């Protein structure tokens, strides 16, 4: 149908896979027990939890004991950064990150600065890439952690983590990566990436909201974020969300199993989308690296554009998209990521993020390519 809704905001969240829901249902009904108990229903819940932990670990190339289940990516980022810094227990501990991180990382670093932690937010180039040489140059004797995302949530750029990890390892500094956007889309084996801590979130790969995980390499100095019971081997207090965790593991298995074929399909659709929009809309610009980016990510800037007006126009035509910016008080603030790329505030505020997913079709891409030039023209700001 020509008027069927088009969902192009998969970087924000993905629909729950029906097969994932099916895997979760027993743990919402018959296997409802608390996994810390000793009776039958509790044992069933514990078995589901253990199987999920083993499955996630195998997918990441990790040990089951290195997986901590959380409520999602933001908690995992907080736990990773605060846990390593607290374990360092050093006055003036130093954290290296980048200027384009998710706010779960940037705001955590900012919060730690209130307690004497020092942070270096490295710049990126005009395509959003971090220079490993700048990582090396930023290291101090007090550097306790390097936290650099695997793939950016706005522009999809994939960072050279293997090079960065070699630098971190040579200096004996733990490396954390926010892999919330990349897990399930591109390979994320922890040894290949060379990371010591990795954050992920189920709802980014067709799993349930409210379920995430943190990988912590054995031997990494780290303290838990919250205290209470002895769940997660004493590393994350609170009764586990068993149904959500089972769903996370099932969604990850399904995403990784189809990753190669789906990645190729999405790249072809994405490249067609990018080429069509750049050709049809004068002044349009692709944000991010042309090739080192997630398969389904396309982010554009349009000069002299009212970004909020464009999003509302798209919504009225049945297209769900995003600016990649924080919406506050009825206006769209310029993206901190695009400002870090050197875009001026007008271009940063006139951004459009289109993120494709498992159900995106070539027909939908054609419809957006036909629709967008008209809507961009209508959303242009009046010349002064």
Residue ranges and their predicted role:
Residues 1-384:
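Pyridoxal 5′-phosphate
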């Amino acid at each position: 149908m020509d008027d069927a809704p088009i969902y192009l905001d998969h970087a924000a969240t993905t629909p729950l896979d029906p097969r994932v829901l099916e895997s979760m249902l027993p743990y919402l009904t018959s296997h409802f027990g608390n996994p810390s108990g000793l009776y039958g229903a509790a044992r069933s819940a514990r078995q589901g939890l253990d199987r999920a932990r083993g499955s996630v670990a195998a997918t990441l190339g990790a040990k089951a004991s290195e997986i901590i289940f959380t409520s999602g990516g933001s908690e995992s980022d907080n736990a990773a950064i605060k846990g390593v810094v607290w374990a360092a227990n050093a006055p003036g501990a130093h954290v290296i990150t980048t200027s384009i991180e998710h706010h779960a990382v940037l705001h955590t670093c900012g919060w730690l600065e209130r307690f004497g932690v020092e942070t270096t937010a490295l710049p990126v180039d005009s395509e959003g890439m971090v220079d490993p040489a700048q990582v090396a140059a930023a290291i101090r004797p007090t550097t306790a952690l390097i936290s650099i995302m695997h793939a950016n949530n706005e522009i999809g750029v994939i960072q050279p983590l293997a090079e960065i990890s070699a630098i971190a390892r040579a200096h004996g500094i733990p490396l954390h990566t926010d892999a919330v956007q990349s897990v399930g889309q591109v390979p994320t084996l922890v040894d290949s990436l060379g990371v010591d801590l990795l954050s992920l979130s189920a709802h980014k790969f067709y799993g349930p909201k409210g379920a995430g995980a943190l990988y912590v390499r054995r031997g990494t100095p780290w303290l838990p974020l919250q205290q209470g019971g002895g769940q997660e081997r004493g590393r994350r207090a609170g009764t586990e969300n068993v149904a959500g965790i089972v769903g996370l593991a099932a969604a990850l298995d399904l995403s990784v199993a189809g990753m190669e074929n789906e990645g190729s399909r999405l790249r072809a659709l994405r490249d067609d989308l990018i080429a069509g929009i750049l050709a049809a809309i004068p002044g349009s610009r692709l944000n991010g690296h042309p090739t080192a980016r997630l398969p389904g990510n396309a982010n554009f800037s349009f000069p002299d554009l009212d970004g909020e007006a464009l999003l509302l126009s798209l919504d009225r035509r049945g297209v769900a998209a995003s600016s990649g910016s924080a919406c506050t008080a009825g206006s769209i603030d310029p993206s901190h990521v695009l400002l870090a790329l050197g875009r001026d505030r007008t271009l940063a505020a006139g951004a459009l993020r289109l993120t494709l997913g498992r159900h995106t079709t070539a027909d939908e891409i054609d419809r957006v390519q036909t629709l967008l030039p008209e809507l961009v023209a209508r959303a242009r700001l009046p010349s002064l």
